[in-house]
């Protein structure tokens, strides 16, 4: 299995000029959020809190999610919540391409993984008649494709889950960054646990703050898992989360607009190549004329970092471009040059890349 973290460490060593690899938002955390965390620390809020999260934070989440506070649990990041669900399953199904953490976590718990592969030619729509697992993980808006399933498309998948008695874990961390109508899975099917976080909309990646929404008994089960592993979220982080939610409506408009502008720019610059224009999130999953890993290595030699498609499943002829890093326009120009060069030399023995010079800064 391709190790995305090892590749990420290599990128950090190279220090490329254009960082279009990780899903690390480059929009700064709002000053008010940071100040709230600092003030909380100054007030001495540094001890343990209740495992499920402080009441004020859960109530604010519940208010805009349209649920009760007892149906919400807060945790240090979304991963531990995903782990709690995977640990309770015997077999896990994942819709691919997907964030590789799902499979990595499943391996840690020795869980079998069923892969439901989707294709670019079918616009990444899952075509499935049976699910042979007791938990399926879905992620829309999708990382890495940017797809947002229509209400009809998501209903078709959830109907199969219901027919097979399968619980659904809906990773909706990019939900507020949807550029089209987004239908939460829990609106269409009862047996759904929704996982969301503060990393993408609020840029609070280092704060490690996530939450889950589910039926009360499910939330109590997740709480027992949190109690036996990571205990709780630091109180000053939760206070920052409360402040972030006060800014939520303003940030949704501001941040969504910023990423939509980038998506439109990137789609225009890469017009003519194979990808589905993103309907949410901030990624482009693009088919390469030749091997995606070799293509990613060539781009890295020119000071542009992207992730190869193998980081997201069995997609050797793809790369994922993140539109949230530095040097975006330069990186997109280099990617287009290399795509054009690869197409021109497709009929030859090998592809040596564009004749343009390697960036001195990017090769450090």
UniProtKB/Swiss-Prot annotation:
GO terms for cellular component: cytoplasm. Its cofactor is pyridoxal 5'-phosphate. The modification N6-(pyridoxal phosphate)lysine is found at residue 200. GO terms for molecular function: L-aspartate:2-oxoglutarate aminotransferase activity; pyridoxal phosphate binding; transaminase activity. Its EC number is 2.6.1.1. InterPro entries: Aminotransferase_I/II_large, AspAT/PAT-like, NHTrfase_class1_PyrdxlP-BS, PyrdxlP-dep_Trfase, PyrdxlP-dep_Trfase_major. It comes from the Archaea. CDD domains: AAT_like. Keywords: Aminotransferase, Cytoplasm, Pyridoxal phosphate, Transferase. It is found in: Cytoplasm. L-aspartate binds at residues 23, 99, 143, 320. GO terms for biological process: amino acid metabolic process; biosynthetic process. It catalyses: L-aspartate + 2-oxoglutarate = oxaloacetate + L-glutamate. Homodimer. PANTHER family: ASPARTATE AMINOTRANSFERASE. Belongs to the class-I pyridoxal-phosphate-dependent aminotransferase family. This is Aspartate aminotransferase.
